[in-house]
Regions:
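Nucleotide and nucleotide-moiety/phosphate-recognizing core
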Residues: 35-124, 130-157
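Short, solvent-exposed coil/turn elements at secondary-structure transition points
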Residues: 83, 107-109, 160, 186, ...
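A generic local structural motif
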Residues: 102-108, 138-143, 166-169, 231-234, ...
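A short, aliphatic-rich alpha-helical micro-motif
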Residues: 111-116, 174, 306-307, 333
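Internal gly/pro-rich beta-alpha loop/helix module
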Residues: 116-117, 122-217
Length: 343
């Protein structure tokens, strides 16, 4: 995922509009991506309540409601402002929903047995300054409902209301989201430690034709980005063709670390995994290991046959080591064999 500043995103959006893409089209494209992602995370239709501000972020939320409605969702909205203060785009998007969605005058109640989503469309990345009283009150309401009702999830559009998109600093009553649908790119503030409890899971919604200048040397690594490194295995492959990982991990009181890292090696696709442990802990750890893991007891790590292995994983849970063991580990590192070393 690209990571960008608020300024660069606003520049990219203006350039796209100037090049001939209407703002309404951008809104529909972004909202379609948000709705699609929502339905992937929540495949069973439920109730979605949009919290709508007077700007175009509210228009995004209303457009998402319209799409969800067409897929069997119940919809409604709460708003901080009278409609005569809404943006023209937001009013047009509301008018397109037929029949009109229910406007909640009081906090919505969760539906038993159905997913309930609170969709944060109160403010976008262009909002500046402290939250106004009416916005802050609805933010607090969303957080209260989410925290009191286990089946309720909050989804923020682009940025949780009350979180600075560039610094990640949250204001009082900032929306605590379970998902943030980042339009075009992830705003840099969402990666700051201060934003962790408010951003939730980040989802990037692509906008065709949007060319945003990303921050230099900054990219958010995702699972889809890593899949190219995991090639499909030929059906004729044998375990000896998929590499042999030598693991040095675990000690008395920290046996779980050995199991976790060995299972990780298997899940990564290693054909063979051999765990080396000292003889005094072998009886404790061997029975707990998955049957695919070979466990070898050693007097010292110097007993390990280095040439046997195509890669090493060293360190999880080994605790303090003797000078002899430390020297053996140094020898392994000096061979240049690919190694994951746990500090």
């Amino acid at each position: 995922m690209k990571v960008c500043s608020t300024e660069n995103m606003q520049i990219a959006e203006r350039e796209l509009i100037v090049s001939g893409t209407p703002a309404r089209t951008l809104m529909k494209l972004a909202s379609a991506g948000i709705a699609e992602s929502l339905m992937q995370f929540f495949p069973d239709p439920g109730l979605c309540i949009a919290y709508v501000g007077k700007g175009n972020n509210g228009g995004d939320a209303l457009t998402v409601l319209n799409i969800l409605k067409q897929h069997g969702w119940e919809i409604g909205f709460r708003t901080a402002y009278p409609r005569n203060e809404w943006s023209e785009l937001s009013m047009r998007q509301l008018a397109e929903i037929s029949p009109p969605p229910q406007e909640y005058q009081a906090p919505p109640l969760p539906h038993t047995g159905k997913p309930m989503i609170l969709l944060d469309g109160l403010l976008g990345i262009g909002a500046k300054g402290m939250l106004r009283r009416e916005i802050s009150a609805l933010c607090a309401e969303m957080n209260y409902i989410r925290n009191r009702c286990g089946a309720v999830r909050t989804v923020a559009i682009d940025i949780p209301t009350g979180v600075d998109p560039d610094t990640g600093m949250p204001q009082q009553n900032a929306v605590e989201a379970d998902f943030t649908m980042c339009i075009g790119a992830v705003k840099q503030g969402l990666l700051d430690d201060d934003a962790t409890l408010f951003a939730g899971r980040l989802v990037c919604i692509d906008l065709p034709g949007l060319h945003v200048q990303a921050l230099p040397a900054t990219e958010l690594i995702t699972s889809s980005r890593l899949t190219k490194f995991l090639s499909a295995r030929p059906y004729t492959d044998y375990k000896n063709k998929r590499g042999h990982i030598g693991v040095i991990a675990g000690s008395e009181g920290m046996l779980g670390a050995a199991r976790l890292c060995c299972e990780a090696a298997l899940r990564a696709g290693a054909g063979l995994v051999t765990l080396h442990v000292h003889k005094d802990v072998y009886p404790l750890i061997a029975p707990s290991m998955p049957p695919e893991i070979m466990v070898r007891p050693v007097d010292s790590y110097a007993d390990i046959s280095i040439r046997t292995f195509s890669a090493f994983l060293i360190g999880p849970g080994i605790g303090s080591v003797s000078e002899e063991d430390a020297e053996a580990i140094r020898l392994i590192l000096e061979t240049g064999t690919p190694t994951v070393l746990d500090a």
